[in-house]
């Protein structure tokens, strides 16, 4: 295996990346290699998918499969090698179906039958050993000796950003929202990568194209979430348990949570959110369920201790699973793209087994003293008081805005974000999103003239809300986003964050501070380009970076 797609990748060798029997995320080499091969297979589907679309015979099920398959290869999503073997077989069958439709259309139209090469020609080996042999030649570092580390790193930037795009698009699709132009963009990016591009300018251009595509995808997901569950409202969320049977839901999928709330209504079971599910409490259609009891625990990297203490079953939706401990292995379930060997998997909102487990387990024996935090400051809530915010800026009551958000993780250096937020002066406002918020969301920030100093915008995909807030403020002040008293301090971990970063760059947003370390696939040569064109900076000392941000705006 060779993998350097996440922030926690091994950096102890001469070349950064996990290249042993097991990666730092817990992914074994077999699973890692099968994931590489699945990406290769999906490129073949996209090659024919792009042609099918121009012929007027698109295959919507194939397009949905591409999103799902790519999602399974994100960090901390699926560790189940057997499921990847099955997905590889399905990928070949899907590609052949799209290919056959293209050929049939060409023959009927009397035009040349398309003949494609590369991933479009791939056929799965008969057994696991054969599949692993195939995977050896299609990893992310394929061609390193020929094209060099910069080109391989840029290919990785495009691929990893695309993985994030596919994950967000899948979230929207399962809620019933999809768009042809998104599928077209995904196919185009995969087909581009299938050609093993080696031109720096073309790779950078495609990376920024993906950033623009991701903005469209995040807008669609925002429409999906608000269309299904209502507009986020500022809401107090209980973070201390109540007595009774309990289920914990982690991950990102609001549709799974809604289905579970419907199925547990009237059972006496309390449902709690964990990690990135916290913003669910701000959506009217979700918080209307009285047994959505609160949020339990912290960010994804705390799950082993959180889940071990939780007295009921756990449902993992979408990404962020890590190896289940023996203390809860028999009471954790996966759904959607998530998988772990030996863990029971539930499909299509089929939750009776999960509910029976909750009824059999003790639940919380007592109600703890109530503690709450506030969520729900999406763009509708913030822009609803935009006049008040603008007046506070003009009056000098608000000096600066900080967006401190993104993915959290366990690596050293992430306390930087806690220190930065807690040191922010009282005349500044901190906006946050993603699970990085757990670094400081219980700190008492107070308010400025009734405007909370901490505004929790939502999940990582709610970066769209943050962008809309920033552009609305820029319009109000008749300036560009880069001219606002606004600093972006971003914590990244995996491929969704890579997609969001590309979106920010595509919008021309400069001087982003990124950490706790820079992506391993961003080579010194590529970093020089990003610094020159976009002013990207690594994080340093929290106090010094804070002072620099305030000084730059004051100047």
Swiss-Prot record:
Pfam families (UniProt xref): Prismane
Cofactor needs: [4Fe-4S] cluster; hybrid [4Fe-2O-2S] cluster
Catalytic reaction annotation: A + NH4(+) + H2O = hydroxylamine + AH2 + H(+)
GO cellular component assignments: cytoplasm
Domain of life: Bacteria
Binding-site positions, hybrid [4Fe-2O-2S] cluster: 252, 276, 320, 407, 435, 460, 494, 496
Record-listed Cysteine persulfide modification sites: 407
Binding sites annotated in the UniProt record for [4Fe-4S] cluster: 3, 6, 18, 25
GO biological process, one term: response to hydrogen peroxide
Biological role stated in the UniProt entry: Catalyzes the reduction of hydroxylamine to form NH(3) and H(2)O.
Name of protein: Hydroxylamine reductase
Organism expressing this protein natively: Burkholderia ambifaria (strain MC40-6)
Gene of this entry: hcp
């Amino acid at each position: 295996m060779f993998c350097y797609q996440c922030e926690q990748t091994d950096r102890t060798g001469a070349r950064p990346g996990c290249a042993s029997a097991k990666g730092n995320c817990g992914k074994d080499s077999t699973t890692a290699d099968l994931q590489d091969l699945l990406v290769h297979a999906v490129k073949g589907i996209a090659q024919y998918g792009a042609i099918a679309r121009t012929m007027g015979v698109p295959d919507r099920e194939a397009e949905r499969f591409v999103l799902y398959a790519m999602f399974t290869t994100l960090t901390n999503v699926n560790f189940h090698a057997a499921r990847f073997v099955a997905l590889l077989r399905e990928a070949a069958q899907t590609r052949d179906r799209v290919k056959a439709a293209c050929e049939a259309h060409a023959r009927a139209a009397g035009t040349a039958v398309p003949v494609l090469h590369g991933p479009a020609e791939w056929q799965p080996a008969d057994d696991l050993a054969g599949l692993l042999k195939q995977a050896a030649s299609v990893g992310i570092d394929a061609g390193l000796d020929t094209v060099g580390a910069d080109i391989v790193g840029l290919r990785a930037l495009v691929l990893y950003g695309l993985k994030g795009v596919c994950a967000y698009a899948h979230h929207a699709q399962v809620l019933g929202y999809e768009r042809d132009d998104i599928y077209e963009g995904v196919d185009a990016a995969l087909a581009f990568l299938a050609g093993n591009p080696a031109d720096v300018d073309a790779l950078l251009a495609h990376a920024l194209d993906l950033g623009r595509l991701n903005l469209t995808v995040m807008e669609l997901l925002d429409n999906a979430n608000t269309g299904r569950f209502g507009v986020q409202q500022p809401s107090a969320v209980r973070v201390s348990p109540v007595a009774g049977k309990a289920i914990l839901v982690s991950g990102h999928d609001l549709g799974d949570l809604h289905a579970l709330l419907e199925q547990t209504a009237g059972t006496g079971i309390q449902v709690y959110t964990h990690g990135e599910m916290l913003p669910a409490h701000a959506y009217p259609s979700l918080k209307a369920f009285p047994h959505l009891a609160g949020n339990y625990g912290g960010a994804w990297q705390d799950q082993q201790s959180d889940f071990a203490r939780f007295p009921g079953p756990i449902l993992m939706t979408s990404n962020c699973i890590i190896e289940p401990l023996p203390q809860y292995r028999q009471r954790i379930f996966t759904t959607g793209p998530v998988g772990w060997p030996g863990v029971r998997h539930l499909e299509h909102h089929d939750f009776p087994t999960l509910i029976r487990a909750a009824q059999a387990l003790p639940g919380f024996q007592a109600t703890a003293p109530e503690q709450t935090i506030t969520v729900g400051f999406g763009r509708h809530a913030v822009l609803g008081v935009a006049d008040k915010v603008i007046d506070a800026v003009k009056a000098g009551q608000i000096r600066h805005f900080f967006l401190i958000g993104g993915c959290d993780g366990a690596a050293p250096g992430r306390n930087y974000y806690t220190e930065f937020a807690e040191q922010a002066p009282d005349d500044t406002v901190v906006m946050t999103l993603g699970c990085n918020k757990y670094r400081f969301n219980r700190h008492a920030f107070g308010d400025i003239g009734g405007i909370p100093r901490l505004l929790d915008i939502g999940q990582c995909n709610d970066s769209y809300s943050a962008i809309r807030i920033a552009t609305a403020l820029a319009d109000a002040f008749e300036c560009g986003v880069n001219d606002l008293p606004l600093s972006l301090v971003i914590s990244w971990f995996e491929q969704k964050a890579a997609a969001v970063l590309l979106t920010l760059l595509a919008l021309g947003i400069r001087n982003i501070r990124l950490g706790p370390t820079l992506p391993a696939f961003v080579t010194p040569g590529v970093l020089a380009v990003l610094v020159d064109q976009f002013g990207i900076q690594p994080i340093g000392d929290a106090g010094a970076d804070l002072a620099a941000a305030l000084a730059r705006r004051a100047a």
